[in-house]
């Protein structure tokens, strides 16, 4: 008699994806982030569902409904802070996951990589709309500033902005539609994650050496299930420390003031995980130029497979490229810091230099260094 997990139509799919999946024997903890992102997504959907049961998407009551969740709902404070800080953890893991893909050359799986970049855009859009929902000062002004960027699109821009707003300013209609989109997008993300996995399982996982590992595979369960559970425990520990000891560490104090269209906060800025892109946007004095740079700062990820000039897939044996990648990471940290600073000297200049170096490293220096390393191989 055949084992049910190998014969049942649905269990068979789960078996081929998470149990009997042939996996390279040498993948490191950097490969944990995929499963951790899946857990984060599930956590966000569950906490979000419970928040939606008590939240009201109306400009007059949105702020007080969030206060009500924190004060009156059983463990409402825990659900709300798990959702808010869960988003931060989600983005940390997302950036680690992308960084690992760049370091080990996983972007050579074109379909998996491209759907991953589209996923990143969708997650960013979802997080932005979620930030608007508490209807605090930073929610309102963040929504106003970011949606206004679309007015830079020639000819149709201003009409498009009013269409998204549902009026002549960010108001009740905007909040209602943002709530609707924020609710539905995570389910679309879940479907896209399944496509992401489908493409990945067509080729199999990459590994730290960047070499073909068909001759050395082990079953996913129990080896990597136990490894993923260890990563999960670390994640839950970090998340609970954040929620229980400093839940507002990554938030903005301005968002504890109800939205007021007549009073602009001194420094309008998005959540910390968007600051690097925000710094690139602000570093260009032209509106359309800034918007294009903002879009391209993420879209540039799609060029990685094209810009790969090295004869080796992974950076494991390429010290020059390794150094360059860590310079890029430092550059992104500088951009994140600049994004949270006021628009004044010397921050403007630092932001412009960091933005130029961000694009130069990826578009010019990385391919050049790869080409040099190819020459060095012949020595």
UniProtKB/Swiss-Prot annotation:
GO terms for cellular component: mitochondrial inner membrane; respiratory chain complex III. Heme b b566 binds at residues 97, 196. Coiled coil: none annotated. Heme b b562 binds at residues 83, 182. Its cofactor is heme b. The keyword Electron transport applies. This is Cytochrome b. It is found in: Mitochondrion inner membrane. The chain crosses the membrane at residues 33-53, 77-98, 113-133, 178-198, 226-246, 288-308, 320-340, 347-367. The gene is MT-CYB. Keywords: Electron transport, Heme, Iron, Membrane, Metal-binding, Mitochondrion, Mitochondrion inner membrane, Respiratory chain, Transmembrane, Transmembrane helix, Transport, Ubiquinone. GO terms for biological process: mitochondrial electron transport, ubiquinol to cytochrome c. Belongs to the cytochrome b family. A ubiquinone binds at residue 201. Component of the ubiquinol-cytochrome c reductase complex (complex III or cytochrome b-c1 complex) that is part of the mitochondrial respiratory chain. The b-c1 complex mediates electron transfer from ubiquinol to cytochrome c. Contributes to the generation of a proton gradient across the mitochondrial membrane that is then used for ATP synthesis. Pfam families: Cytochrom_B_C, Cytochrome_B. Heme 1 (or BL or b562) is low-potential and absorbs at about 562 nm, and heme 2 (or BH or b566) is high-potential and absorbs at about 566 nm. The cytochrome bc1 complex contains 11 subunits: 3 respiratory subunits (MT-CYB, CYC1 and UQCRFS1), 2 core proteins (UQCRC1 and UQCRC2) and 6 low-molecular weight proteins (UQCRH/QCR6, UQCRB/QCR7, UQCRQ/QCR8, UQCR10/QCR9, UQCR11/QCR10 and a cleavage product of UQCRFS1). This cytochrome bc1 complex then forms a dimer. Its main location: mitochondrion. One of its GO terms (molecular function) is metal ion binding. The keyword Cell inner membrane does not apply. It is a multi-pass membrane protein. It comes from Echimys chrysurus. Binds 2 heme b groups non-covalently. InterPro entries: Cyt_b/b6_C, Cyt_b/b6_C_sf, Cyt_b/b6_N, Cytb/b6-like_sf, Cytochrome_b, Cytochrome_b_C_euk/bac, Cytochrome_b_N_euk/bac, Di-haem_cyt_TM.
């Amino acid at each position: 008699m055949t084992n049910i997990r190998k014969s049942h139509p649905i269990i068979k799919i789960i078996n081929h994806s998470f149990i009997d999946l042939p996996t390279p024997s040498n993948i490191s903890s950097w490969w944990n982030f995929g499963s951790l992102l899946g857990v984060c997504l599930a956590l966000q959907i569950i906490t979000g569902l419970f928040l939606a049961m008590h939240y009201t998407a109306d400009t007059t009551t949105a702020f007080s409904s969030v206060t009500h969740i924190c004060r009156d709902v059983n463990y409402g404070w825990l659900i709300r802070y798990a959702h808010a800080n869960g988003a931060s953890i989600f983005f940390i893991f997302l950036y680690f996951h992308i960084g690992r893909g760049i370091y080990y050359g996983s972007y050579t799986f074109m379909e998996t990589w491209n759907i991953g970049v589209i996923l990143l855009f969708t997650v960013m859009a979802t997080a932005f709309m979620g930030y608007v929902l508490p209807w605090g000062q930073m929610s309102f002004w963040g929504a106003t500033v970011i949606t206004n960027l679309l007015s830079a699109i020639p000819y149709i821009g201003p009409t498009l902005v009013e269409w998204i707003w549902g009026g002549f300013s960010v108001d009740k209609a905007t909040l209602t539609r943002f709530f609707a989109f924020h609710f539905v997008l995570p389910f679309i993300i879940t479907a896209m994650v399944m496509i992401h996995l489908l493409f990945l399982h067509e080729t199999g996982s990459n590994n730290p050496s960047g070499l073909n590992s068909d001759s050395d595979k082990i079953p996913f369960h129990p080896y990597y299930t136990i490894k993923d559970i260890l990563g999960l425990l670390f994640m839950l520990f970090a998340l609970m420390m954040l929620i229980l000891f400093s839940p507002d560490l990554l938030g903005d104090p301005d968002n504890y003031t109800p939205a007021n269209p007549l009073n602009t906060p001194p420094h309008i800025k998005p959540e910390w995980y968007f600051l690097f892109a925000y710094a690139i946007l602000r570093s260009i004095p032209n509106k359309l130029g800034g918007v294009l740079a903002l879009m391209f700062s993420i879209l540039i990820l799609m060029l990685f497979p094209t810009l790969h000039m090295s004869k080796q897939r992974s950076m494991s044996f390429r010290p020059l490229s390794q150094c360059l990648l860590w310079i890029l990471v430092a550059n992104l940290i500088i951009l994140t810091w600049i994004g949270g600073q006021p628009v004044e000297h010397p921050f403007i200049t630092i932001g412009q230099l960091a933005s130029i170096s961000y694009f130069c490293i990826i578009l010019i220096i990385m391919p050049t260094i790869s080409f040099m390393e190819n020459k060095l191989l012949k020595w």
